[in-house]
Amino acid sequence: MSNPLLSLNYEPAIQALGGDYYDEVLSAEFPQHILRFRNDQLLPKIGLNSQDVKDEHFIEAFGKFHCVRPFLALRYHGYQFGEYNPYLGDGRGFLYGQVRGVDDELYDFGTKGSGRTPYSRSADGRLTLKGGVREVLAAEILHRHGVRTSRCLSLIETGEGLWRGDEPSPTRSSVMVRFSRSHIRFGTFERLHFYKRPDLTKKLLNHVINCYYSNLKKENISQKDPFQDCYFLFYLELVKRIAKLVAQWMAAGFCHGVLNTDNMSITGESFDYGPYSFIPTYNPKFTAAYFDYSGLYRYSHQPLVCKSNLQLLQEALAAVIDRKNMRSALEKFDDFYLHEYRQLMMRRLGFKKLAEADADKLLQLTIKMLTDSQVGYHDFFLELRQKFSPEWRDDISQIFADFEQPELIDPWRQYYYHLLQTYSDNELEEMTERLQQYNPQQSLIRPVIESVWEAITLEDNWQPFYDLLQQIYD
């Protein structure tokens, strides 16, 4: 039987742009291949039936890397903690291939841990198994939260011992294949600006619009240059996408950890999960990465950092897009962000279409209560999901009746009760459904991840990992 993963109609979209954007590389050879995770939810998106794709097919395609060539290590630079770094690029992964989904959109298969490339520098090009497990979990819980995110298609343990400064070593190795819209980053354009290649910038920008913003071409009015009127609209749409993305992170209680420009996708998708963390309690100063000594990428700073990264990108795009137009587009970021964040938080609280003033007051009271009480951020929303009852509209005493610090929740409780008075019986039932939909049963705070990893590393017990994934999906 032929391998369905190798029989896909791979589309060389990046390769067709030419060698200015990538280096052709080879994959590493590994001593062992154990499939630890396969994402059957993604297979229908590329026209495959999960029953037709066997475990050995994943190993052949995404562990042994048979048949599909060439592999492309993409070139990029980036601002890392505010400093420009021209020595970047895919250092432990490559673009495996691109396929057209059943929705006619273009998707990437990108590897992580597949071996050394010209951009590995002194690193080994490998991915720790713990790093792979963490990325699988991050992507799936964020997807469950409704975040526009890359996801892991497969995770294969590869039988090597790796040495890392931030993990007990030797630690186990893995190779992952990531499923995403694109691996083109802000830093991809920043590299072209660094080398003063406006021709390559325009060529890549046309490609991005064609593949990921094709709806904009229908809005252009210029006959002389079919892209000219799209460039500003592209940047405006990117501003909107990034604003919505960071609002989704904030509502989910997610702290990315390393918001360098090389970790930001030009499609506005969340990807590349390293030292991320979910906030245990509402703490604006919470920092995910142990090496972020200044707190630059702290939880509350994420919207400002994303806006700043969009501003930095203007320099790289200025050869094609008018600076004044980009500045005016970026001025809309705050409004895009606040609108999305307000809407997402109201959903988590069960409401829909509240008046803006009511929503803002409830949001203010919610954040104050979470800050003052230091109740678990995810615990609060899970408890709201589990305990909410239409009877709350008639009896305020039932609303979080057993909250340990009643004086801290009382202002919130009073206003929540006030808003319930405007809801009909049918609307209260819809609230119950929203609370179920937007508040996952499982959180992904550090102790949860460490518990899963402890079972794997001490006993090679993967059941807690699979159980956690199932709880995320439920």
Swiss-Prot record:
Record gene name: ydiU
Classification via PANTHER family: PROTEIN ADENYLYLTRANSFERASE SELO, MITOCHONDRIAL
Coiled coil residues, start to end: none
Name by which UniProt lists this protein: Protein nucleotidyltransferase YdiU
Cofactor: Mg(2+); Mn(2+)
Residues reported to bind ATP: G89, G91, R92, K112, D124, G125, R178, R185, D272
GO MF annotations, alphabetized: AMPylase activity; ATP binding; magnesium ion binding
HAMAP family referenced in this protein's UniProt entry, alphabetically: YdiU_SelO
Annotated catalytic residues: D262 (proton acceptor)
Enzyme class: transferase
Residues annotated for Mg(2+) binding in this entry: N263, D272
Family per similarity comment: Belongs to the SELO family.
Catalysed reactions listed for this entry: L-seryl-[protein] + ATP = 3-O-(5'-adenylyl)-L-seryl-[protein] + diphosphate; L-threonyl-[protein] + ATP = 3-O-(5'-adenylyl)-L-threonyl-[protein] + diphosphate; L-tyrosyl-[protein] + ATP = O-(5'-adenylyl)-L-tyrosyl-[protein] + diphosphate; L-histidyl-[protein] + UTP = N(tele)-(5'-uridylyl)-L-histidyl-[protein] + diphosphate
